[in-house]
């Protein structure tokens, strides 16, 4: 069996076998992870943030994602764990002085070195291109290489001096195992936050009840309110009449308090003549007119 030109085909050219799985280029994958936003697929530009799983985002893209209330969000699965802006940390990155960016190959006649990175480790000097493991601190956002944290063991950040714990260290663009560990940490953190809120609620209720009790039973106040003195005749009569009433209510049987007279006071004679206890009021019926009364009752 031949073809034009006298060629004899082989069997593997005629029989189609199973398709080979296409392998992803590792260099292209690293470039995509470390130079492009996971959410918008755009080039990373400051401010750059990272989530609790160690993925890199543009802060503008995260804000737009959170503000988008539509049911179908683009690439929502990549950021489904981000519920608020508090779930991301703004990174403090150190620039690489050897990185030229687009300025080095403006004409397109040079080879682009994909291994050259924009940022480096401020301690060791390793480039953040995916060849070395990098991590950041959730408390302050400083980025270091994992080698720097292992070689210089400290409980304080090497750049800003902020204290941190092991849970605050998050690996950037880690493996599947690293992502599983970070997911378990996220769940533990959220459980702690819920328990903290539940414990705060009864404390707030107790403080509110104590404040209500204190308002109902106030203590003695030493502040004197500046009220004007009452100078009218009616108010003075009320004061004189209220003294024996209060004494009788409290069970006080002193004769002086019960039989107090206006004649004992130091007021003027004109003022004393207004009351029935004055000598001018003790006249006989013949001396006083029948239509004149000194009080609300008749003699």
Curated annotation (Swiss-Prot):
Name of the protein in its database record: Replication termination factor 2
The UniProt record lists the keyword Cytoplasm: no
GO molecular function: DNA binding
Lineage: Eukaryota, Metazoa, Chordata, Craniata, Vertebrata
Function in brief: Replication termination factor which is a component of the elongating replisome. Required for ATR pathway signaling upon DNA damage and has a positive activity during DNA replication. Might function to facilitate fork pausing at replication fork barriers like the rDNA. May be globally required to stimulate ATR signaling after the fork stalls or encounters a lesion. Interacts with nascent DNA.
Pfam families xref list: Rtf2 (PF04641)
The organism of origin for this protein: Bos taurus
PTM comment, free text: Undergoes proteasomal degradation, via DDI1 and DDI2. Removal from stalled replisomes and degradation are required for genome stability.
UniProt entry keywords in alphabetical sequence: Chromosome, Phosphoprotein
Gene (UniProt): RTF2
């Amino acid at each position: 069996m031949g073809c034009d030109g006298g060629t004899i085909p082989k069997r593997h050219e005629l029989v189609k076998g199973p398709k080979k799985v296409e392998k992803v280029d590792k260099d292209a994958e690293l470039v995509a992870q470390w130079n492009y936003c996971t959410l918008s697929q755009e080039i990373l530009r400051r401010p750059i943030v990272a989530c609790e799983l160690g993925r890199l985002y543009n802060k503008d893209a995260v804000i737009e994602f959170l503000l988008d209330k539509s049911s179908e969000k683009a690439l929502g699965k990549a950021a489904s764990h981000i519920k608020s802006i508090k779930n991301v940390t703004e990174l403090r990155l150190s620039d690489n002085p050897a990185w030229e960016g687009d300025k080095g190959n403006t004409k397109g006649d040079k080879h682009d070195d994909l291994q050259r990175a924009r940022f480096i480790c401020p301690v060791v000097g390793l480039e953040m291109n995916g060849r070395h493991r990098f991590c950041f601190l959730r408390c302050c956002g400083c980025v270091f290489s994992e080698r720097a944290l292992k070689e210089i063991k400290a409980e304080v950040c090497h750049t800003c001096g902020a204290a941190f714990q092991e849970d605050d260290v998050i690996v950037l663009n880690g493996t599947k195992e690293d992502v599983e560990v970070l997911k378990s940490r996220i769940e533990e953190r959220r459980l702690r936050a819920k328990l903290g809120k539940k414990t705060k609620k009864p404390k707030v209720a107790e403080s509110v009840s104590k404040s209500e009790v204190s308002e109902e039973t106030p203590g003695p106040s030493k502040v004197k309110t500046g009220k004007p003195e009452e100078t009218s005749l009616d108010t003075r009569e009320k004061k004189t009449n209220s003294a024996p009433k209060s004494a009788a209510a409290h069970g006080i049987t002193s004769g002086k308090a019960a039989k107090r007279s206006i004649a004992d006071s130091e007021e003027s004679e004109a003022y004393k003549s207004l009351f029935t206890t004055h000598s001018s009021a003790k006249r006989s019926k013949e001396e006083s007119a029948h239509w004149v009364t000194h009080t609300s009752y008749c003699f």
